[in-house]
């Protein structure tokens, strides 16, 4: 059952500003407004802004305000609602909120306005995620992707998934209702083909949700190498800031130095690590220990080598560290000097010179391509943890159904798994009956959203 009681919150954030916004929504919220707001005329037409004064029960003026009125179902929540634009002082905003609460509203929970929008069919869960990402976005590309998801421009894969599952369910019902009909090899092959397509679509959706995660949560990139190969210089060149100290003395960097780079819309946190070698003192040991921790946590590793020196034991240690890592870029610095370094034939290095500032754009391009691969902006979606779990469960069920068809199991049994598969896909959009799951989805929203 949907709670349609009146809720209220400071939507503009509890910070001092020129204007504060108090959002109010729920059944009879307009009646509440009439108790506390005194405009020139006391009849409220929706989608208009009214000037007037807020007064308490003693007719004391609380603030001079502008009020926007919205009528159900044409509001953010789908309910009658209004927003008060007051002066943005902390005390004034709190006084206005207290006035609303004293007259029948309760304080909204985090994300409760958006939860009501979802429950009233104003948005689906993909759009709810998009609203969070609009707020979190740190780059223009992230904003573009979030707006695309909010406007349902990038839900093609999900709609295609639903259509294919519905087709299989309909075909299976025919077999249940008419058991005398034999399942021909042609029909079986058609079903298996569709299941293969469903599997590929789910895998594609999981992949593109991972790409979406990069744009909103960012990527950790660790620069590693032995001392004095130019790791700090590379950090400075990549970010365009002299963030790290650069000297000719090996082992200058003893702690992790980080800086953020906006790489074509992807926020990248670049970590300059301490040079990895056999440590000479406790401080260097701690720095190297942190370097190994950064390597384990990194999404991508940039391993830097000095091309002007022959391969030594410390370089070999670096190669051993990265040999089983998935996303690694090998960089040969000091390419302006005579090359003496020889690497294994299976390595495709990127040659740069931090001194001459060459090769940096090539490195950035390789880094970006490693992240996005065959990324298509129109297909990238942002999913929360629950939705990703549902997708992975759907993938398992699709494979289970395929085996059931091959083994000629009873269509009635297959029907159960098809329904479960459909339910998992519906969870991505938002067909969720469990209130606890819904609360978990919306608890990460800010208060007033």
Question: Residue ranges of each PLM-predicted region?
Answer:
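Conserved beta-strand segments of alpha/beta enzyme cores
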Residues: 106, 267-269, 348
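Glycine-rich, N-terminal phosphate-binding loop of Rossmann-like dinucleotide-binding domains
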Residues: 88, 238, 273, 305-308
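Inter-motif core of Ras-like GTPase G domains
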Residues: 284-308
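Short beta->alpha junction loops/turns
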Residues: 25-26, 89, 250, 307-308, ...
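A glycine-rich (often HGG/GG-containing) alpha/beta subdomain
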Residues: 1-144, 148, 152, 163, ...
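Generic enzyme active-site microenvironment
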Residues: 270, 304, 331
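C-terminal-of-GTPase-core extension/linker across diverse P-loop GTPases
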Residues: 2-10, 14, 55, 140-259, ...
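Switch I (G2) and immediately adjacent beta-strands of P-loop GTPase domains
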Residues: 51-71, 251-279, 297-300
């Amino acid at each position: 059952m949907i709670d349609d009681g009146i809720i209220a919150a400071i939507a503009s954030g509890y910070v001092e500003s020129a204007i504060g916004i108090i959002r109010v929504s729920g059944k009879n919220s307009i009646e509440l407004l009439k108790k506390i707001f005194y405009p020139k005329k006391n009849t409220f037409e929706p989608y208009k802004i009214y000037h007037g004064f807020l007064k308490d029960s003693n007719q004391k003026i609380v603030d001079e305000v502008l009020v926007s009125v919205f009528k159900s179902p044409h509001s953010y929540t789908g309910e009658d609602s209004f927003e008060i634009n007051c002066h943005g002082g902390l005390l004034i905003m709190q006084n206005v909120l207290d006035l609303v609460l004293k007259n029948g509203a309760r304080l909204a929970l985090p994300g409760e306005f958006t939860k009501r929008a979802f429950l009233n069919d104003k948005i689906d869960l993909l759009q709810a995620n998009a609203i969070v990402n609009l707020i979190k976005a740190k780059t223009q590309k992230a904003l573009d992707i979030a707006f695309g998801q909010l406007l349902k421009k990038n839900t093609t894969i999900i709609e295609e998934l639903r259509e294919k599952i519905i087709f299989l369910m309909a075909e299976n019902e025919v077999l249940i209702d008419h058991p005398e009909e034999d399942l021909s090899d042609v029909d079986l092959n058609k079903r298996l083909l569709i299941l293969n397509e469903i599997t590929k679509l789910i895998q594609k959706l999981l992949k593109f949700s991972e790409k979406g995660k990069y744009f909103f949560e960012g990527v950790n990139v660790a620069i590693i190498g032995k001392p004095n190969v130019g790791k700090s210089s590379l950090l400075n060149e990549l970010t365009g800031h002299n963030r790290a100290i650069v000297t000719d003395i090996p082992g200058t960097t003893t702690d992790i130095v980080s800086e953020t780079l906006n790489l074509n819309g992807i926020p990248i946190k670049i970590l300059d690590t301490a040079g990895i070698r056999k440590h000479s003192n406790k401080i260097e040991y701690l720095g190297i220990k942190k370097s190994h921790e950064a390597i384990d946590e990194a999404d991508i590793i940039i391993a830097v080598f000095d091309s002007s020196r022959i391969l030594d034991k410390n370089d070999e240690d670096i190669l051993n560290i990265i040999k089983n890592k998935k996303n690694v870029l090998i960089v040969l610095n000091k390419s302006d000097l005579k090359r003496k370094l020889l690497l294994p034939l299976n390595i495709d290095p990127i040659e740069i010179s931090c001194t001459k500032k060459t090769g940096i754009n090539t490195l950035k391009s390789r880094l970006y391509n490693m992240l996005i691969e065959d990324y298509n902006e129109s297909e990238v979606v942002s999913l929360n943890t629950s939705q990703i779990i549902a997708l992975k469960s759907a993938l398992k069920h699709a494979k289970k159904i395929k085996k059931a068809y091959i083994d000629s199991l009873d269509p009635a049994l297959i029907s159960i798994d098809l329904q479960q598969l459909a339910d998992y896909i519906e969870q991505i959009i938002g067909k969720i009956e469990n209130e606890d799951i819904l609360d978990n989805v919306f608890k990460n929203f800010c208060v007033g959203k």
